[in-house]
Design a protein with these regions (language model features):
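Short loop/turn motifs that connect adjacent beta-strands in outer-membrane beta-barrel proteins
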Residues: 27-43, 56-58, 99-109, 151-163, ...
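Membrane-embedded beta-strand positions of outer-membrane beta-barrel proteins
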Residues: 43-45, 111, 163-165, 212, ...
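Transmembrane beta-strands of outer-membrane beta-barrel pores
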Residues: 49-55, 115-119, 167-171, 226-232, ...
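Flexible, surface-exposed loop regions and adjacent strand-edge segments
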Residues: 60-66, 126-132, 179-186, 229-230, ...
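Flexible glycine-rich, low-complexity coil/linker segments exposed to the extracellular/periplasmic environment
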Residues: 61-82, 237-242, 249-292, 342-423, ...
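Detector for outer-membrane/organellar transmembrane beta-barrel domains
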Residues: 88-90, 94, 320, 457, ...
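Outer membrane beta-barrel
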Residues: 105-256, 635-637, 656-658, 664-665, ...
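Outer-membrane beta-barrel "beta-signal"
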Residues: 713-725
Length: 725
């Protein structure tokens, strides 16, 4: 199950490009003023058209084995499969317009709206799975009201103050590119940044709040805010070009597919065994999300200016109580009916195969298996239909005739029956408390602008490895079925890999098997996260140069960031069972548990594990410990631009580049910023004339970190034109 690594970190390269574009001069807005001069306003509009093309071949490690690749998950590959042969992924018309009206600088209002229509998306121009109506509403066609607030400026005693009420964006801190810092007030649309020619203000989405600003003294100011609405971040929808999550985004498949890549999200065709297509084979369905209340978010900051420190230095102090905008995932164990039907499936397969082996005719063996399955299910709380029991009996008999493993087939079908009665859901924990410090200044000797911040968060929900969550959610099935089959049960914490209950004994979270007084299974919640304290550090330097490569001006920005999570449990010996506690990292589609690996056993493709995976003592593939979240993780971004004014007539030419590298460690999810070895680079050229017309063409490439870089094969070329008036 891959969930949230399509969050703020995904749009990293696009964010850099948008920020670099934001510092370009823009056209003067249409301004107006009343005859008296009391009323004044401005209206600014930008219309853009952009196209993007895929220019790299798909990486088989990011496509499930059952879908034609060599990867271990069918829950991340819809975006890849939709553009296997189709190179054009977007052809979008965009618009942003904003209107400001004010009276004597005392009060006024500001409104901003945006819109998008992507001809490629709306034309269902994909190779495999057309985007759903919900997904198209995110990346295909929409109009949005962004900011819409009123403001009042007044003196509170002798203190100049301002009150703003309504939908608005509040930016905190000093981070330029790297996410995870102090700028956590508003929510974010990752998809908006992937549109060629997009502007950052299209991705920073406002929430409804009241904001009070006041100048407490010559050098000290404060800001207080209270939010009365909440929205989650908008992630890439399932099937879009940049999507790496088929489970949780808009238009998702609404289910997690088990089987470590051996099972397709399109289902399993048992026709060769007489069973037909089973679309929901070994899937866990999605339950309704646990959405938080709208209220309960508030914060305050203070800014203090030191005029004599350097060339002037501003310090910032922050506090924010907020609700997570990126989801964590928890699971629900299955029902008594699911366990009963699983027992019925085992009996259908086994009885049919045994009857056939005993000399019965094929039709007679199927009848025996059908009856045995229904009786077993009914006796244990199940409701297996005659048609399903007959299907399983047919599969069991044909598996025997084909020389297959009847016991493994029975286990597969039983797992499928139980998993259908499970569930997973997203939740957004509340009352995360963030404390922060920031500074910005300028070095006297070189004129270099420097800025930095540190953000400390208390009770941050960190996502536990999803494979371990699934293992834990299957413990009632494993233990319950073993009891029904009168097999010995190994309890939690007593790891015997070759026993009847290896998951129960060896998984890192223990057993969730629980029954009532009548012995019926009780459904349990497998909490998908742990609350931890975290630190995020950020430092940025910006230098402007003259006469570089004959350019009018050159700008170079360097930003480094780091995440620190003290107290993470040992990955192999920590946690509640002493078998480790691993927090999720991107692309960890297998277990990191050396006692389980790819259980149910899934051997390596062609006898070899996919690169970076390693075999465990039982011949299965598993993830190395370095693939999961680490205590420290850090990376950096370098961005630069040359400016050639009037290079060709009135046209200005601006070559630009960005380089992003995650150096060491893995930031914990959801939405972790860093994954060691991951890189992204962009080179482009912008041409503008009279600050009204702008053309841009760029090439972006992703690399490093192997299958743990979920965008490793999404290199693209983008071109856009924008007209501002």
């Amino acid at each position: 199950m891959r969930r949230v690594h399509t969050g703020r970190a995904l749009g990293f390269a696009a964010t850099v490009a948008c920020v670099m574009a934001a510092v370009l001069p823009r056209a003067q807005a249409f301004s107006f003023r009343s005859d008296s001069g009391d009323w004044a306003g401005s209206w600014d509009t930008t219309i853009g058209y952009g196209m993007g093309w895929r220019v790299s071949n798909p990486d088989c490690r990011l496509i499930a084995i059952a879908n034609g690749g060599c990867g271990y998950s069918p829950n991340i590959d819809d975006g890849d499969l939709n553009y296997l042969h189709k190179t054009e992924y977007t052809k979008a018309l965009t618009g942003v317009t904003e209107l400001q009206l004010k009276y004597k600088e005392q009060f006024g209002a500001f409104v901003r709206a945006s819109g998008l229509y992507d001809f490629s998306v709306m034309g269902n121009d994909v190779d495999r799975t057309p985007l759903s109506h919900e997904a198209k509403g995110v990346v295909g066609s929409y109009t949005r009201l962004l900011d819409a607030f009123g403001f009042l400026r007044f003196d509170l005693g002798s203190l100049p103050s301002e009150l703003r009420v309504g939908r608005q964006v509040v930016s905190w801190g000093e981070s330029t590119f790297i996410p995870g810092g102090l700028n956590s007030v508003d929510y974010f649309d990752v998809t908006a940044l992937q549109v060629p020619g997009a502007e950052l203000k299209q991705a920073l989405l406002p929430d409804s709040m009241v904001v009070f600003n006041s100048q407490l003294s010559k050098n000290l100011s404060t800001q207080l805010l209270y939010l009365w609405s909440w929205h989650p971040d908008i992630l890439e929808p399932t099937g879009a070009y940049f999507s790496t999550n088929d489970v949780a985004g808009a238009g998702s498949n609404q289910r997690v597919v088990l089987g470590f890549g051996a099972v397709s999200d399109m289902g399993v065709d048992f026709s060769p065994l007489g069973g037909g297509l089973v679309k929901d084979f070994q899937t866990i369905p999605r339950l309704p999300d646990h959405r938080p209340p709208e209220s309960g978010q508030y914060g305050i900051n203070f800014k203090y200016y030191l005029p004599n420190f350097g060339q002037g230095t501003q310090l910032g102090f922050y506090f924010l109580n907020y609700t997570s905008r990126v989801p964590v995932v928890s699971l629900q164990t299955g029902t008594p009916a699911g366990l009963g039907n699983a027992y019925g499936a085992v009996n259908s397969v086994a009885a049919a195969a045994q009857a056939l082996a005993a000399g019965n005719s094929f039709s007679s063996a199927v009848q025996i298996g059908t009856a045995a399955g229904q009786q077993a299910a009914a006796a244990t709380g199940g409701n297996l239909t005659a048609a399903t029991a007959q299907q399983y009996a047919t599969i069991g008999a044909n598996t025997l005739l084909a020389g297959g493993n009847v016991n493994a087939q029975a286990a597969n079908l039983a797992t499928s029956e139980y998993s259908r009665t499970q569930g997973f859901y997203e939740e957004f924990p509340q009352d995360i408390k963030m404390f922060g410090l920031s500074f910005n200044s300028q070095l006297q000797s070189t004129g270099t602008a420097i800025q930095g911040e540190v953000a400390y968060r208390h009770d941050v929900p960190l996502q536990i490895d999803d494979v371990e969550l699934i293992y834990a959610s299957l413990t009632p099935f494993e233990t319950g079925l073993a009891n029904l089959l009168h097999e010995p049960v190994t309890g939690p914490g007593h790891c015997v890999p070759n026993s009847a209950t290896p998951i129960t004994g060896c998984n890192q979270l223990g057993s969730y098997y629980k029954t009532d007084a009548q012995g019926r299974l009780i459904s349990q919640t497998v909490k998908g996260y742990a609350l931890k304290d975290t630190y995020h550090f950020d430092l940025t330097a910006t230098q402007v140069f003259a006469n570089v490569f004959k350019a009018s001006q050159a700008v170079l920005i360097f930003e480094a960031g780091a995440d620190y999570v003290p107290g993470l449990e040992d990955k192999l010996s920590g946690g509640p069972q002493g078998f480790g506690l691993r927090f999720d990292g991107p692309g960890t589609n297998l277990s990191g548990n050396p006692n389980l690996g790819g259980y149910p056993e899934f051997p390596a493709v062609g006898g070899q594990c996919v690169a970076s995976s390693v075999p465990n003592p039982h011949g299965q593939c598993l993830e190395p410990g370095a693939a999961f979240a680490t205590t420290w993780a850090w990376g950096y971004v370098i961005a630069g631009r040359l400016e050639y004014n009037n290079a060709i007539g009135d046209w200005n030419l601006l070559p630009h580049f960005t380089w992003q590298q995650d150096v060491t460690g893995v930031s914990p999810g959801p939405g972790g910023a860093f994954r060691a070895g991951r890189i992204a680079a962009t080179m482009g050229l912008t041409a503008s004339v009279r600050n009204m017309l702008e053309l841009d063409v760029s090439f972006t490439t992703y690399g490093g970190a192997g299958q743990y870089n979920l965008l490793n094969d999404r290199d693209f070329v983008a071109a856009s034109v924008k007209f501002s008036f």
